[in-house]
């Protein structure tokens, strides 16, 4: 009887696992990106302002 049943539970478990992995991956990438942006925000801002000022003259 269990062999005739469709494998609904493993598919459901795999879907949950996949969604968890994707969520964790997105969270890690966003955290790393946020920390990097915050760390280099002042440097990027200064260099961008200097570049725009030099090219506006």
UniProtKB/Swiss-Prot annotation:
It is found in: Virion membrane; Host cell membrane. The keyword Metal-binding does not apply. GO terms for biological process: symbiont-mediated suppression of host NF-kappaB cascade. GO terms for cellular component: host cell plasma membrane; membrane; virion membrane. Disulfide bonds: none annotated. Keywords: Host cell membrane, Host membrane, Host-virus interaction, Inhibition of host NF-kappa-B by virus, Membrane, Transmembrane, Transmembrane helix, Virion. Pfam families: SH. InterPro entries: SH (IPR001477). It comes from the Viruses. Residues 30-57 are intravirion. Residues 1-8 are virion surface. It is a single-pass membrane protein. Interacts with host TNFRSF1A, RIPK1 and IRAK1; these interactions interfere with host NF-kappa-B activation at the level of receptor complexes. Interacts with host protein UBQLN4. Belongs to the rubulavirus small hydrophobic protein family. Plays a role in the inhibition of the host NF-kappa-B pathway. This inhibition occurs at the receptor level, by preventing the signaling of TNFR1 as well as IL-1R and TLR3. This is Small hydrophobic protein. It comes from Mumps virus genotype B (strain Urabe vaccine AM9) (MuV). The gene is SH.
